[in-house]
Amino acid sequence: MLGMSSVLAGLARFADPGGIVTGELAMTNPLDPALFRADAVTEDTRALNEILVKLLTPLPDWWVVGAANAREGRRRGNGPFPPPVMSTRAVVRSIPGREGHAIPLRIIAPENPRGVYLHIHGGGWVLGGADMQDPMLERTADKTGLAVVSVEYRLAPEHPWPAGPDDCEIAAHWLLDHAADEFGADRLLIGGASAGANLAVATLLRVRDKHDAADRFVGTNLLYGPY
């Protein structure tokens, strides 16, 4: 399991024009299959997994209590995590969505950013929000020098596919057009965890196939997820 320091170091490396890991280098260093054996899991990781299982097992499934109730419960701290802590540094602005709706972007930026990280939150495409991990986004901005832009994409089941991917694509396209003017830097990175990682990959594919601009994103931060 990667620690936050490793993740931040990786983002910082991609944000540095001289620190990009090329595709050729990546191909010569494939993942060691031994990393995926059961005995490769450390005792610390096993202990953490056991704690998570105990915390999550008593919780009702969202489809039983309803998505809206599950989201509200998460915000009250009824679950494995405490109530979210909001950053006083966060700035929210909205961009127009494809269906005439507003897409909020939650921005936490350091002084003189050297790049922009498009963050897509997780939550199984149903839960979570752009404002529910401000402390992590603050650390990301401060440790990497990146402006962090977290997109508040529409959630299922109220907004079924492709609503969420559409909103993420529009956020990425907005950064392609406006990052340099808004943040003084046009080096773009993208990432997220769980469903956020899935949406990050889907967004990159759309940027490549529909906008011919995949090379504008110089790095990805895919913590875990279905991709």
Model-derived regions: residue spans:
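Short beta-strand-to-loop junctions in surface cap/lid or active-site-entrance loops
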Residues: 105-115
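Short beta-strand element of the alpha/beta-hydrolase
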Residues: 114-123
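Catalytic nucleophile-loop/oxyanion-hole region of alpha/beta-hydrolase
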Residues: 129-130, 136, 149-187
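Primarily recognizes the serine-hydrolase "nucleophile elbow" in alpha/beta-hydrolase
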Residues: 170-181, 186-227
